[in-house]
Amino acid sequence: IDAYLSQTPHHYTTGDGGYRDSDGYLYVMGRTDDVINVAGHRISTGSIEAVVASHPVVAECAVIGVRDDIKGQLPRAFVVVKSGIEIDAERVAAEIKESVRKRIGAIASVKDVVIVPALPKTRSGKILRKTMRGIADGRDEPTPATIEDPSVLVAIAPLLQAPIE
């Protein structure tokens, strides 16, 4: 129990990552113990997601580690834009990358920001990150029985498999 109470005085460390928006609402994005290994550094995808999600046009996001021959894994962000907002995808991607670099550090730099219409989720609303990682790594992932809308996974599979730019 000391490990959960000793990191920040008067606060309990849950291991969840998130952010507070400008209206004061708290969003829990996921576990900070979901880590990727980038050039020998263990980086929390939840921490990266919290920064990505704080961008004003982002409705939701998922960050996964994709295989890289040199660094082991590279962070790749999949972003759903808030409805009704027209964006310049390249500008938004550059802003997200810069924000992650400034707030977490260069080692956590998102190498690719992919704008998607939706993220694959379970019926209870959890993003299917493990399935996304498997497809990105070239594995033949079965469609989970708990998936809310299988067409979302079919639609983004080519984007998951695309090489990092």
Q: What name fits each language-model region?
A:
Residues 1-5, 17-18:
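AMP-binding/adenylate-forming core of the ANL superfamily
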Residues 2, 64-68, 118:
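Short, solvent-exposed loop/turn elements at beta->coil junctions and helix N-caps
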